[in-house]
Amino acid sequence: MPATKERTYNETEIAERLKELPGWYFEDGWIRRVYKTDGWPTTLMLVNAVGYLAEAAYHHPDLTVTWGRIIVKLQNHAAGGITDKDFELARKIEEVALWRPQGGALEGTPNKWVRPGDPK
């Protein structure tokens, strides 16, 4: 039985879906997110977290890594565009990258850590 090609989204549909993912944007065929960090150690921890999620999902983003920033780019190469896999992995990355303990025994770090904000 031949494999079914995954549904890809057009730019209008992508823009609508990205409303659910503040900070993510569509550019040059990729959905993207810039995460700013408080420096190299935090950047590396975030890269490792993204790598773990990508490997567990078996869907791998392109990453750009600098001292205080990581850029995540997602698209489904096999499908030739943006698919549900991209949105699902983006949502999980966002959840993990911006998670902070609230209302429990965990105190959380006093550092700024990963900063949401300007996507570019």
What are these regions (language model features)?
Residues M1-K120:
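Long, contiguous binding/interaction regions
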